[in-house]
């Protein structure tokens, strides 16, 4: 089942490692980096990179105490954040598309071209 969940999470723009670590935190609660290294067997540097990605995606939270502990937000909150981020990127692409179409259509040489291609 976890493999299926990881695959589904990936459709939300989450890497396999992020999905796996998120599920670990969702199942275990608060953990330190050292505890996550022990649980997953992954290098500490990879855990830090993955945690930073999950923090950027608002899928986990970190404590203000030392040692820092990380915990997963609820799956609903995490997926809502992922959907909002994807929607933002889609809106950015739409704006860029409009700007590119206008720029290309404004070119002086464009006005004299036909709509078809000649080879």
Residue ranges and their predicted role:
Residues 3-18, 32, 64-85:
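Short, cationic-aromatic polyanion-contact patches
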Residues 21-25:
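Short alpha-helical "packing" element that flanks the helix-turn-helix/winged-helix DNA-binding module
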Residues 26-32:
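Short capping segments at the starts of secondary-structure elements
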Residues 33-34, 45:
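Residues within helix-turn-helix
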Residues 35-40:
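A short acidic, leucine-rich amphipathic alpha-helix
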Residues 41-53:
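Short amphipathic alpha-helical interaction segments
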Residues 55-63:
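A short, conserved structural fragment
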Residues 80-119:
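Amphipathic alpha-helical dimerization/coiled-coil segments
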